[in-house]
Amino acid sequence: MAVVVALLINPVGLVFWLALGLTIWFAVNRTDRERRRYLRAIHPKHPEIGRFFWIGLVVGALVSLVMVIGRLQISLAALLALSGLTLVALLFSKWRFSPWWLGLASLAAVGQSGLLAEQHAANLAILVGLLWLTQAGLARFNRGDEIESPVIQQDRRQRQSAAFELRQLFWVPLILPVAVENVSNLPLLAVTVQSLTFVGLPLLLGATFMTPRDRAQTAWRRSWPWYGGAGGVLIVYGIVARTMTLPLLVSLVFPAVVSLVLVGGFIWQGRQVHLTVTLADQGVVLIGVVPHTPAAEMGLQPGDRVLACNHHSVNNSRELYDAIQKEPTYCRLRLRQADGELRLAETAIFAGAPHELGMILFPEETA
């Protein structure tokens, strides 16, 4: 048991190393796949690795500061539950990761009793609320377009379409106050100050998923009202539970119920269709845009369909390339956006490299 505790409640323990390894693997796998399918990596510098560290560290410092200043102690059972749930979620992060399950940690205190247990349960609700509010902020202000990657899919009729994948994890190391009696004689990285013991806890925020029904960055952004609302509700509940006498059972069940409401909302949201990108007979369909290229300067987006280039109609990459050669230092496009609107776009082209527009098209059609 002591070894399990030491592995789980340690900012640089099992959760950290597994998350770091997965983040590196996600990033390298993404660039390798893009080079195989599209002949280039859309984002070759692996920005998701740097963000794993610095964004998570900032978030961890802010949340820890609130918990320490407020002297909001958490039970050891809740800490173990949070770390254990994080570890389980990591095992499934290849397919999907979303920290909706944080509220389930409240159930770890079932069987406890007394005023101290009630305070710990209320404090846990506040902690989970803060983490969900942070997740809402990350989703709302995300720059997921920098790590969004198109994935080619085929239906039963062999028609090609594009899904969009986003894999971004944030390591959030927390320093949390725990009652001294909870951690005595346990192998923890802990510091005791004035009857409070501060213990390190590794958590993860972020998202990993693939969707054929929307851009990945906008799909993640749509989750922020859910997380923001749930986080606000839990913080208010935790404050009320600390100042009023509420049954312990309510404080144990309420965060778990909110977690289930969250995941139900995400399942419903995931079934909504906002964008479908399929290979078309007319025009050339974009499924990605390389940053800092003429395509990016023109504001092109996945789902846009190029109908004409330099006043020549185009229906495939060969026709697009030939049209670019008509005016090798400038590019004028007529395109239909994903919302159906027609617009014109134009920009200068890199001198001596008219083929490097930065458009990612369906395989064998990259320009």
Swiss-Prot record:
Primary localization class, coarse: membrane
One Pfam short name: PDZ_6
GO cellular component, one term: plasma membrane
Domain PDZ: from-to ranges: 261-339
Membrane topology category: Multi-pass membrane protein
Record field: transmembrane: 2-22, 49-69, 72-92, 97-117, 119-139, 186-206, 226-246, 248-268
A biological-process GO annotation: division septum assembly
Cell compartments where the protein resides: Cell membrane
Top-level taxon: Bacteria
Keywords assigned by UniProt, alphabetized: Cell cycle, Cell division, Cell membrane, Membrane, Septation, Transmembrane, Transmembrane helix
Task performed by this protein: The main function of the Min system is to promote the disassembly of the cytokinetic ring after cell division, thereby ensuring that division occurs only once per cell cycle. MinJ acts as a bridge between DivIVA and MinD. May modulate activity and localization of MinD and MinC through direct interaction with MinD.
Family indicated by similarity: Belongs to the MinJ family.
Protein name as annotated: Probable cell division topological determinant MinJ
Organism of provenance: Lacticaseibacillus paracasei (Lactobacillus paracasei)
Underlying gene: minJ
